[in-house]
Protein backbone atom coordinates (compact mmCIF):
# COMPACT_ATOMS: atom_id res chain seq x y z
CA UNK A 1 0.00 0.00 0.00
CA UNK A 2 1.37 3.43 -0.93
CA UNK A 3 1.82 6.27 1.56
CA UNK A 4 -0.90 8.19 -0.30
CA UNK A 5 -3.37 5.33 0.04
CA UNK A 6 -2.55 4.89 3.71
CA UNK A 7 -3.07 8.59 4.46
CA UNK A 8 -6.35 8.72 2.56
CA UNK A 9 -7.75 5.70 4.37
CA UNK A 10 -6.60 6.92 7.78
CA UNK A 11 -8.55 10.16 7.28
CA UNK A 12 -11.83 8.34 6.79
CA UNK A 13 -14.14 8.42 9.85
CA UNK A 14 -14.28 5.12 11.71
CA UNK A 15 -17.84 3.85 11.39
CA UNK A 16 -18.30 2.56 14.93
CA UNK A 17 -22.04 3.18 15.00
CA UNK A 18 -23.25 1.37 11.89
CA UNK A 19 -26.73 0.01 12.59
CA UNK A 20 -27.33 2.35 15.51
CA UNK A 21 -30.31 4.71 15.50
CA UNK A 22 -29.92 8.15 17.08
CA UNK A 23 -32.21 11.06 17.90
CA UNK A 24 -30.68 14.51 18.45
CA UNK A 25 -32.77 17.45 19.66
CA UNK A 26 -31.87 21.01 18.82
CA UNK A 27 -30.08 19.56 15.81
CA UNK A 28 -30.26 22.43 13.32
CA UNK A 29 -27.43 24.51 14.80
CA UNK A 30 -24.74 24.72 17.46
CA UNK A 31 -23.87 21.67 19.55
CA UNK A 32 -26.81 19.65 18.26
CA UNK A 33 -25.82 20.13 14.63
CA UNK A 34 -22.20 19.20 15.29
CA UNK A 35 -22.96 16.05 17.25
CA UNK A 36 -25.60 14.93 14.74
CA UNK A 37 -23.06 15.27 11.93
CA UNK A 38 -20.52 13.23 13.88
CA UNK A 39 -23.07 10.51 14.54
CA UNK A 40 -23.73 10.37 10.81
CA UNK A 41 -20.00 10.18 10.07
CA UNK A 42 -19.77 7.27 12.50
CA UNK A 43 -22.38 5.33 10.56
CA UNK A 44 -25.50 5.93 12.65
CA UNK A 45 -28.96 6.59 11.29
CA UNK A 46 -29.79 10.04 12.66
CA UNK A 47 -33.07 11.86 13.26
CA UNK A 48 -32.56 15.62 13.37
CA UNK A 49 -35.18 17.13 15.68
CA UNK A 50 -35.67 20.90 15.73
CA UNK A 51 -38.12 23.56 14.65
CA UNK A 52 -36.19 24.01 11.40
CA UNK A 53 -34.39 20.76 10.49
CA UNK A 54 -34.27 21.78 6.83
CA UNK A 55 -31.50 24.25 7.69
CA UNK A 56 -29.02 21.44 8.17
CA UNK A 57 -30.54 18.69 6.02
CA UNK A 58 -30.12 20.85 2.93
CA UNK A 59 -26.35 20.83 3.59
CA UNK A 60 -26.04 17.04 3.72
CA UNK A 61 -24.95 14.92 0.76
CA UNK A 62 -27.71 13.16 -1.16
CA UNK A 63 -28.29 9.72 0.31
CA UNK A 64 -27.27 10.62 3.86
CA UNK A 65 -28.79 8.33 6.47
CA UNK A 66 -30.63 11.23 8.07
CA UNK A 67 -34.15 12.54 8.36
CA UNK A 68 -35.48 15.76 9.83
CA UNK A 69 -38.48 16.20 12.09
CA UNK A 70 -39.92 19.67 12.64
CA UNK A 71 -40.95 19.61 16.29
CA UNK A 72 -41.43 22.47 18.73
CA UNK A 73 -40.12 20.85 21.90
CA UNK A 74 -41.51 23.74 23.92
CA UNK A 75 -45.02 22.52 23.07
CA UNK A 76 -44.64 19.87 25.72
CA UNK A 77 -48.08 18.24 25.53
CA UNK A 78 -47.24 16.60 22.20
CA UNK A 79 -43.51 15.92 22.55
CA UNK A 80 -43.67 12.34 23.81
CA UNK A 81 -46.03 11.16 21.08
CA UNK A 82 -43.97 12.87 18.37
CA UNK A 83 -40.76 11.24 19.60
CA UNK A 84 -42.52 7.87 19.72
CA UNK A 85 -43.54 8.40 16.09
CA UNK A 86 -39.89 9.01 15.18
CA UNK A 87 -38.88 5.78 16.93
CA UNK A 88 -41.53 3.92 14.97
CA UNK A 89 -40.34 5.51 11.73
CA UNK A 90 -36.70 4.61 12.46
CA UNK A 91 -37.52 1.11 13.62
CA UNK A 92 -36.00 1.65 17.07
CA UNK A 93 -33.67 3.93 18.99
CA UNK A 94 -30.24 3.36 20.52
CA UNK A 95 -28.99 6.88 21.25
CA UNK A 96 -30.77 10.01 22.49
CA UNK A 97 -28.98 13.35 22.75
CA UNK A 98 -31.13 15.84 24.68
CA UNK A 99 -29.55 19.09 23.54
CA UNK A 100 -32.34 21.61 22.87
CA UNK A 101 -32.42 24.53 25.28
CA UNK A 102 -32.83 28.25 25.78
CA UNK A 103 -31.59 30.94 28.16
CA UNK A 104 -32.91 34.07 29.84
CA UNK A 105 -30.72 36.85 31.19
CA UNK A 106 -32.12 39.20 33.80
CA UNK A 107 -32.80 39.57 37.50
CA UNK A 108 -35.37 37.14 38.81
CA UNK A 109 -37.44 40.01 40.23
CA UNK A 110 -38.19 41.16 36.68
CA UNK A 111 -38.77 37.80 35.01
CA UNK A 112 -42.33 37.25 33.73
CA UNK A 113 -43.96 33.98 34.76
CA UNK A 114 -44.57 32.98 31.16
CA UNK A 115 -40.86 33.35 30.36
CA UNK A 116 -39.98 31.18 33.38
CA UNK A 117 -42.45 28.53 32.27
CA UNK A 118 -41.26 28.60 28.66
CA UNK A 119 -37.65 28.09 29.74
CA UNK A 120 -38.50 25.17 32.03
CA UNK A 121 -40.77 23.60 29.42
CA UNK A 122 -37.88 23.42 26.95
CA UNK A 123 -34.87 22.90 29.22
CA UNK A 124 -36.43 20.32 31.55
CA UNK A 125 -39.94 19.12 30.76
CA UNK A 126 -39.19 18.34 27.11
CA UNK A 127 -36.29 16.17 28.31
CA UNK A 128 -38.67 14.31 30.63
CA UNK A 129 -41.01 13.77 27.67
CA UNK A 130 -38.21 12.50 25.42
CA UNK A 131 -37.07 10.12 28.15
CA UNK A 132 -40.55 8.69 28.54
CA UNK A 133 -40.71 8.15 24.79
CA UNK A 134 -37.40 6.29 24.35
CA UNK A 135 -37.11 4.28 27.56
CA UNK A 136 -39.64 1.53 26.74
CA UNK A 137 -37.73 0.65 23.55
CA UNK A 138 -34.34 0.84 25.24
CA UNK A 139 -35.55 -1.33 28.12
CA UNK A 140 -36.91 -3.95 25.76
CA UNK A 141 -33.54 -4.22 23.99
CA UNK A 142 -31.64 -3.98 27.30
CA UNK A 143 -29.31 -1.24 26.10
CA UNK A 144 -29.24 2.39 25.10
CA UNK A 145 -27.31 5.61 25.58
CA UNK A 146 -28.85 8.89 26.71
CA UNK A 147 -26.82 12.07 27.02
CA UNK A 148 -28.34 15.21 28.51
CA UNK A 149 -26.58 18.45 27.65
CA UNK A 150 -26.53 20.44 30.88
CA UNK A 151 -24.11 23.24 31.82
CA UNK A 152 -21.69 24.42 34.47
CA UNK A 153 -24.64 26.67 35.33
CA UNK A 154 -26.13 23.48 36.76
CA UNK A 155 -23.33 23.36 39.30
CA UNK A 156 -22.92 27.02 40.22
CA UNK A 157 -25.38 29.90 40.37
CA UNK A 158 -24.63 33.01 38.32
CA UNK A 159 -26.30 36.41 38.84
CA UNK A 160 -28.90 37.27 36.19
CA UNK A 161 -29.03 33.62 35.13
CA UNK A 162 -31.25 32.30 37.93
CA UNK A 163 -33.87 30.59 35.77
CA UNK A 164 -31.30 29.00 33.48
CA UNK A 165 -29.24 27.81 36.45
CA UNK A 166 -32.31 26.38 38.15
CA UNK A 167 -33.29 24.46 35.01
CA UNK A 168 -29.81 22.99 34.62
CA UNK A 169 -29.52 22.09 38.32
CA UNK A 170 -32.84 20.28 37.89
CA UNK A 171 -31.64 18.56 34.71
CA UNK A 172 -28.60 17.19 36.52
CA UNK A 173 -30.79 15.87 39.32
CA UNK A 174 -33.09 14.23 36.79
CA UNK A 175 -30.12 12.71 34.97
CA UNK A 176 -28.62 11.25 38.14
CA UNK A 177 -31.94 9.74 39.25
CA UNK A 178 -32.76 8.26 35.84
CA UNK A 179 -29.22 6.88 35.54
CA UNK A 180 -29.77 4.93 38.75
CA UNK A 181 -33.22 3.75 37.63
CA UNK A 182 -32.06 2.58 34.22
CA UNK A 183 -28.68 1.04 35.07
CA UNK A 184 -30.28 -2.35 35.86
CA UNK A 185 -31.84 -2.26 32.38
CA UNK A 186 -28.50 -1.81 30.61
CA UNK A 187 -29.17 1.84 29.74
CA UNK A 188 -26.50 4.50 30.22
CA UNK A 189 -27.72 7.97 31.18
CA UNK A 190 -25.00 10.61 31.27
CA UNK A 191 -24.68 14.38 31.37
CA UNK A 192 -22.18 16.82 29.95
CA UNK A 193 -21.69 20.22 31.56
CA UNK A 194 -19.93 22.61 29.20
CA UNK A 195 -18.78 26.05 30.18
CA UNK A 196 -19.55 28.92 27.82
CA UNK A 197 -20.06 27.72 24.25
CA UNK A 198 -20.16 30.02 21.24
CA UNK A 199 -23.54 28.99 19.82
CA UNK A 200 -26.38 30.88 18.12
CA UNK A 201 -28.13 30.95 21.52
CA UNK A 202 -26.15 34.10 22.29
CA UNK A 203 -27.64 35.80 19.24
CA UNK A 204 -31.14 35.39 20.70
CA UNK A 205 -30.21 37.33 23.85
CA UNK A 206 -29.44 40.61 22.10
CA UNK A 207 -28.16 43.49 24.21
CA UNK A 208 -28.61 41.46 27.41
CA UNK A 209 -25.24 39.84 26.77
CA UNK A 210 -22.54 41.76 28.69
CA UNK A 211 -19.91 43.39 26.44
CA UNK A 212 -17.24 41.61 28.48
CA UNK A 213 -18.33 38.23 27.06
CA UNK A 214 -15.64 37.28 24.56
CA UNK A 215 -17.35 34.71 22.37
CA UNK A 216 -14.12 33.91 20.57
CA UNK A 217 -12.66 32.60 23.84
CA UNK A 218 -15.58 30.24 24.45
CA UNK A 219 -15.74 26.55 23.62
CA UNK A 220 -16.81 25.78 20.08
CA UNK A 221 -19.81 23.55 19.35
CA UNK A 222 -17.42 21.18 17.57
CA UNK A 223 -15.32 20.76 20.72
CA UNK A 224 -18.38 19.93 22.80
CA UNK A 225 -19.62 17.54 20.12
CA UNK A 226 -16.30 15.67 20.21
CA UNK A 227 -16.68 15.27 23.97
CA UNK A 228 -20.22 13.97 23.53
CA UNK A 229 -18.96 11.43 21.00
CA UNK A 230 -16.44 10.26 23.59
CA UNK A 231 -19.39 9.45 25.86
CA UNK A 232 -21.30 7.75 23.05
CA UNK A 233 -18.31 5.57 22.15
CA UNK A 234 -17.45 4.38 25.65
CA UNK A 235 -17.06 0.61 26.02
CA UNK A 236 -20.21 -1.22 27.07
CA UNK A 237 -18.84 -1.77 30.57
CA UNK A 238 -17.89 1.88 31.19
CA UNK A 239 -19.81 5.06 31.98
CA UNK A 240 -18.91 8.68 32.74
CA UNK A 241 -21.76 9.89 34.87
CA UNK A 242 -21.07 13.60 34.39
CA UNK A 243 -18.46 15.27 32.19
CA UNK A 244 -17.46 18.88 32.90
CA UNK A 245 -15.86 20.61 29.92
CA UNK A 246 -14.39 24.09 30.35
CA UNK A 247 -12.80 26.61 27.97
CA UNK A 248 -9.06 26.74 28.42
CA UNK A 249 -9.40 30.53 28.62
CA UNK A 250 -10.99 30.11 32.04
CA UNK A 251 -14.48 31.44 31.25
CA UNK A 252 -17.45 29.94 33.02
Model feature map: region roles:
Residues 28-29:
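Conserved glycine-rich cofactor-binding loop
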Residues 42-57:
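Conserved glycine-rich Rossmann-like NAD(P)H-binding loop of the short-chain dehydrogenase/reductase
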Residues 107-108, 115-120:
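Substrate-binding pocket helix/loop in short-chain dehydrogenase/reductase
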Residues 131, 167:
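Active-site helix of classical SDR
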Residues 151:
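Residue(s) in the substrate-gating loop at a strand-loop-helix junction
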Residues 156, 177-187:
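Active-site-adjacent segment of SDR/Rossmann-fold oxidoreductases
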Residues 191, 212-252:
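C-terminal helical subdomain
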Amino acid sequence: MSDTQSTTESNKPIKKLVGKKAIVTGASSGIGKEVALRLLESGAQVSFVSRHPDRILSELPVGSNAKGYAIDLGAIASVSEQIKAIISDMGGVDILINNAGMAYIGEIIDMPLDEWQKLFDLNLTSVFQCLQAVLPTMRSQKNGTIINVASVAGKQGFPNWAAYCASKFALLGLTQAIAAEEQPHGIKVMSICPGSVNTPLWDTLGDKVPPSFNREAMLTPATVAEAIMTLVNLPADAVINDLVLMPNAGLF
